[in-house]
Design a protein with these regions (language model features):
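P-loop NTPase switch/communication element
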Residues: 1-14
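Alpha-helix C-terminal capping segments
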Residues: 7-8, 32-34, 151-157, 207-212
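Switch II (G3) loop of P-loop NTPases
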Residues: 12-27, 189-195
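AMP-binding/adenylate-forming
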Residues: 13-18, 30, 35-42
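Residue-level marker for buried hydrophobic side chains located in beta-strands
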Residues: 15, 75, 189, 218-219
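Short, glycine/acidic-enriched loop or turn micro-motifs at the edges of active sites
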Residues: 21, 46, 81-82, 194-196, ...
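Acidic, Mg2+-coordinating active-site environments of NTP-dependent enzymes
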Residues: 38-188, 213-214, 239-248, 256-263
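Active-site beta-alpha connecting loops in nucleotide-dependent enzymes
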Residues: 174-176, 193-263
Length: 263
């Protein structure tokens, strides 16, 4: 992130940076460098639980950014994370925008979600607008992320048409995350092995299940950095996999065996 800041010039209007962390105090340090005005917390899963102790610890580390946001700013959060972040909301002076499914009653919601094999779409409802969004990515988790992006984009006065065009033409910047590799004889390889965690693995399995009735094969390995959630995290994936009806399962690693046992 600091290297990115050195490339700014007088023409830069908006800078988007990722603040990654594996421990307490790291986002605090990055905020002192970047001075964010708006923020998104894409989710509070179990990644890095080994270092942060618990999901509540992960929430504490990610919400360190709250105290740096100005009153004129905004932060977009998932409604499903409300219980985890609520203890730290008193530190946030910025406007909090809750995002969710329409049934959950957030300020920015999705409805009529359609998840196709290699794309997704939904209707976005906001206090001042309702519009349709097409995403060039498969998976419900991309819809959730798009809601968060939309909430902050509107907070900085980006137009609805620009939001639609931007989301519709988005590209993945990370390797080994939901990479689609077409193969011979109409086969498709989905590579989502970068620092996998239970939430990301479940999301990928949902995408894979969307290709049925074509034969589906899941090749799953160990998930690391889960700490006390190590066994339950793998078991959770196994239970979900059983519900999705994947045809064949290959497990690589002693932890991944737990997935197979629960299937």
């Amino acid at each position: 992130m600091p290297l990115t800041l050195t490339r700014l010039d007088e023409k830069t209007e908006i800078l988007i940076v990722e603040m990654g962390m594996t421990g307490f105090g790291e986002i605090d340090f990055l905020c002192q460098i970047a001075h964010p005005t708006h923020a998104i917390i894409t989710g509070i899963g179990l990644v890095h639980a080994e270092y942060l102790g618990s999901q509540q610890g992960i929430a504490r580390a990610k919400t360190e950014l709250f105290r740096y946001l100005p009153e004129s700013g905004a932060v977009a959060l998932r409604e499903k994370d409300r219980a985890l972040v609520t203890p730290y909301l008193d530190e946030c002076k910025a406007n909090v925008i809750w995002c969710s499914d329409a049934a959950d009653g957030g300020a920015v919601t999705s409805e009529n979600v359609v998840l196709a094999a290699e794309k997704s779409s939904f209707d976005c409802h906001m206090p001042d607008a309702t519009f349709h969004v097409e995403l060039p990515f498969a998976g419900r988790h991309y819809v959730d992320n798009a809601l968060l992006v939309t909430a902050v984009a509107r907070a900085i006065d980006i137009s609805v048409s620009d939001i639609q065009n931007g989301l519709g033409s988005a590209v993945s910047l990370s390797s080994s995350r939901m990479e689609m590799h077409p193969l011979a004889e109409d086969r498709l390889l989905i590579n989502d092995c970068y620092n996998a965690n239970p939430d990301s693995m479940i999301a990928t399995l949902d995408v894979l299940a969307g290709y049925k009735p074509r034969p589906t094969i899941a090749c799953l390995g160990n998930m690391y950095e889960l700490g006390q959630y190590e066994v339950e995290g793998h078991a959770k994936v196994g239970r979900h996999l059983a519900e999705r009806g994947i045809d064949w399962l290959i497990c690589l690693g002693t932890l991944a065996e737990i997935i197979g046992e629960k299937r």
